[in-house]
Amino acid sequence: MSAQELRDKTPDQLRDELTALKKEAFNLRFQQATGQIENTARMRQVRRDAARVKTILNEKAAAAANAEA
């Protein structure tokens, strides 16, 4: 998911997306531990997508704080 697509979402949608990514990362870790994972690159992609979502959430929070001040 691109950063621009994420910036168009609301903070609630971003939190939902982050929750889904964390669940997927959890499942991928279990698949790796049991040797069932097929696409190991997906772990990296999920981890980076989660970081991207967190970054944009922080940007939106900072923008809201600056708007209030």
UniProtKB/Swiss-Prot annotation:
Q: List the disulfide bonds.
A: none
GO function terms (MF aspect):
structural constituent of ribosome
* One annotated GO biological process: translation
| Family annotation (Pfam families) | Ribosomal_L29
Q: Which GO terms describe its cellular component?
A: cytosolic large ribosomal subunit
| UniProt keyword annotations, A-Z | Ribonucleoprotein, Ribosomal protein
Q: SUPFAM superfamilies per the record?
A: Ribosomal protein L29 (L29p)
For the keyword Ribosomal protein, the answer is yes
Highest taxon above the source species = Bacteria
**Keyword Ribonucleoprotein carried by entry:** yes
Q: Which residues form a coiled coil?
A: none
Which HAMAP family does this entry report, sorted A to Z? Ribosomal_uL29
The record's section on NCBIfam families has: L29
Similarity section = Belongs to the universal ribosomal protein uL29 family.
Full protein name: Large ribosomal subunit protein uL29
Organism equals: Jannaschia sp. (strain CCS1)
